[in-house]
Amino acid sequence: MRKLSLVVLLSLLNAASAEQSYLVDWDAVGREAIDHLVELVKIPSVNPPGNETAVAEYVRAVLVAEGIDSKLYALDPTRANLVARHEGNGRKPPILIMGHTDVVGVQPEKWDADPFSGIREDGYIYGRGTLDDKDNVAAGMMVMILLKRLVVELDRDVIFLAESGEEGTPDVGINFMVEKHWDVIDAEFSIAEGGQGVIRDGRVHTFGIETTEKMPRRVTLVARGTPGHGSMPRLDNAVMILANAVAKASAWQTEMRLNETTETYFRRLAAISPPDEAVLYENVTNPEMTLAIQQQFLETFPYHYSILRTSVVPTVIDAGFRRNVIPSEASAILDIRMLP
């Protein structure tokens, strides 16, 4: 979280006049940003139903205390988006910083701690939204705060958008802002979630930049068979048929395909990695080594395995209503992320 805020802010400060210099206590900034992240995590905004307005109101209150104007835009009054702007001299088009205020659902019984507690322990913060995406909301908010405190003069406006509905309901969030309020978020480019940062020994080792995205697709597999009593096995048991289909889909290794971005990524990663890792990155396309490398990625570096191919992952299985009854139908959802 702290590293992200520093990277974003430094990129903006570097865009200012070379004659300007800013004295910043980054440790203090980091602590302040983390304090805000904890408070954001404490606000439940599970989508559905959302309740993102509560998060937006917190952000607005923090910005108001810093003398920063902001405005809420809502298709649904409980699911507001927040926009704030730091004005530059207008020589260049604006830059947009984004973070989404909703989070995915939780199964509290699976958690060791309350998912909305923001507990700090052993250098970690525990809670839903710490990684997706209230960390970016806190970072974006801190960018706006520091630009204001330091009176940073830029050649472009900096816009901060805390959006609702990213987790599956964009009609109240980014779609609404684009279709109805494009003028307040129109920018030359945007900094948002995506890419990946790696910290080693307390320092940033790599910071990946996303140039395009996979396309998400959902496929539902449905198996039908003859219902009956669990004491009498059947060859057309819908659960058995579905299980075999899911197993085949899980074992299917789609074709590996690199593009200019991933080729550059592995080449540069090899140059800064330990020898035992570098050899993997250097030989991803080596016909004699690629299968073994891909298998190692699958076992130990799933992120690297995924960016090489379209992924097919079963996520939800639905079957049966009694433990002693063979159901007539069973279904499974496959989460497919297609290479561009």
What residues fall within each predicted segment?
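Acidic-enriched catalytic cores of C-N bond-cleaving enzymes acting on peptides and small amides
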Residues: W182-D186, G195-V204, E210-P216, G230-V316, ...
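Extracytoplasmic/secreted envelope proteins and their assembly/folding machinery
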Residues: I34-V38, T53-A56, R60, V137, ...
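C-terminal catalytic subdomain
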Residues: I326-P340
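Sec-dependent signal peptide recognition
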Residues: R2-V7
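Acidic/His- and Gly-rich active-site-bordering loop/insert found
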Residues: E19-T130, V137, L147-R156, L334
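Hydrophobic beta-strand positions in extracellular immunoglobulin-like domains
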Residues: H86, A223, I336-M338
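Hydrophobic h-region of N-terminal signal peptides that target proteins for export
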Residues: L9-S17
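Acidic/histidine-rich catalytic neighborhood of metal-dependent amide-processing enzymes
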Residues: I125, L131-G208
